Amino acid sequence: MFGKGGLGGLMKQAQQMQERMQKMQDEIAQLEVTGESGAGLVKITLNGAHNCRRIEIDPSLMEEDKEMLEDLIAAAFNDAVRRAEEMQKEKMASVTAGMSLPPGFKMPF
């Protein structure tokens, strides 16, 4: 029913995949991505766990409109999140290669 290796082989493969995924998640958490807005005037750096590590604001913006600065910060944050998710997807692709995952399924769980 389970082919060569039987159920034991299937369980071993599942355990190995789980270990590889955990290792990759740990590696991803250590990586950093930077999102930008306003042609680099606002930069936000997140780690792979989406925790904010750093916010950089060009001094010229301190004299500008408060609402514009808030919009630029939000845009930079959203850009950083998008980049972090892309990076995670690329890194996890090697672990999930050959698995049929449903559309929109995000890794790690």
UniProtKB/Swiss-Prot annotation:
GO terms for cellular component: bacterial nucleoid; cytosol. It is found in: Cytoplasm, Nucleoid. InterPro entries: YbaB-like_sf (IPR036894), YbaB/EbfC (IPR004401). Its main location: cytoplasm. The keyword Endoplasmic reticulum does not apply. Pfam families: YbaB_DNA_bd. Keywords: Cytoplasm, DNA-binding. This is Nucleoid-associated protein Asuc_0997. It comes from the Bacteria. Binds to DNA and alters its conformation. May be involved in regulation of gene expression, nucleoid organization and DNA protection. Belongs to the YbaB/EbfC family. Residues 1-23 are annotated as: Disordered. Homodimer. One of its GO terms (molecular function) is DNA binding. It comes from Actinobacillus succinogenes (strain ATCC 55618 / DSM 22257 / CCUG 43843 / 130Z).
